[in-house]
Amino acid sequence: MKLPQLLLILLFVVLADSVQPKRCFSNVAGYCRKRCRLVEISEMGCLHGKYCCVNELENKRHKKDTVVEQPMEPRDKSKVQDYMVLPTITYYTITI
């Protein structure tokens, strides 16, 4: 009697595990599948020869906008600017 009960419990555990595909690793918002759907792209590989399928439309919505750096304003030429004198080495001198 315990064997059929154990088999029944294991059957439900296996079915519940395979209902939703596994998530991709490395912080990629996708699912591991054998074939990607039409609106999905393959980002990287998953285990057991599957692809990490990411929905293109969702991925574009969640991408963060990049911050554009402002160009530097030209300096006022009336201000004094520091400069640096580099040392030089003389290898030989020519006398005329």
UniProtKB/Swiss-Prot annotation:
<feature type="disulfide bond">
    <location>
        <begin position="24"/>
        <end position="52"/>
    </location>
</feature>
<keyword id="KW-0211">Defensin</keyword>
<dbReference type="Pfam" id="PF13841">
    <property type="entry name" value="Defensin_beta_2"/>
</dbReference>
<keyword id="KW-0044">Antibiotic</keyword>
<keyword id="KW-0964">Secreted</keyword>
<dbReference type="GO" id="GO:0050830">
    <property type="term" value="P:defense response to Gram-positive bacterium"/>
</dbReference>
<dbReference type="InterPro" id="IPR050544">
    <property type="entry name" value="Beta-defensin"/>
</dbReference>
<feature type="disulfide bond">
    <location>
        <begin position="32"/>
        <end position="46"/>
    </location>
</feature>
<keyword id="KW-1015">Disulfide bond</keyword>
<comment type="similarity">
    <text>Belongs to the beta-defensin family.</text>
</comment>
<dbReference type="GO" id="GO:0050829">
    <property type="term" value="P:defense response to Gram-negative bacterium"/>
</dbReference>
<keyword id="KW-0929">Antimicrobial</keyword>
<protein>
    <recommendedName>
        <fullName>Beta-defensin 20</fullName>
    </recommendedName>
</protein>
<feature type="disulfide bond">
    <location>
        <begin position="36"/>
        <end position="53"/>
    </location>
</feature>
<dbReference type="GO" id="GO:0005576">
    <property type="term" value="C:extracellular region"/>
</dbReference>
<comment type="function">
    <text>Has antibacterial activity.</text>
</comment>
<feature type="signal peptide">
    <location>
        <begin position="1"/>
        <end position="21"/>
    </location>
</feature>
<dbReference type="InterPro" id="IPR025933">
    <property type="entry name" value="Beta_defensin_dom"/>
</dbReference>
<dbReference type="GO" id="GO:0045087">
    <property type="term" value="P:innate immune response"/>
</dbReference>
<keyword id="KW-0732">Signal</keyword>
